[in-house]
Amino acid sequence: MCMVILFDQYNLPTDIYEIIFATTQQVEVAKMLINEMKVKGGEIGKTEMSMFATALHDGKDIEIVTGEGPFRKKKKENISYNKRQFYDRILTPMKTMGLIDYDLYKKTYKISEKFNKNMMRVGLMWLQDLRKPPIK
């Protein structure tokens, strides 16, 4: 599986999730997942992940903040996300990009810094290609 990230360097969102995910619902679900993992010390088990996905499938209340600066508004909203789609569109891409690691032996998901290292590697690949002589 290959994830493609397209962004406009002149209108780069300040929120990393908005760069990675296509829809606002995916952004909210990804934020909820990372927050849940942070609350649990950055690591959750396979069963806890399944319970999180089931809770999303059944519907979960969240607080959404809209607007900028002093004009921010908070509103409560119920978010529901299909369990299979959660694994396909949120968790699997986060694992393949290096945002989340899965330990096969401990059967746990852990927040990872590999995404940052991979992005630096992509930048270096671009610089190397830039410095290559032209093809004749």
Residue ranges: model-predicted function:
Residues G45-K75:
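DNA-recognition alpha helix
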Residues D103-Y105:
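Structural motif
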Residues K107-S112:
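Minor-groove-contacting beta-hairpin "wing" of winged helix-turn-helix DNA-binding domains
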Residues K114-K136:
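Short, amphipathic alpha-helical interaction segments positioned at domain boundaries
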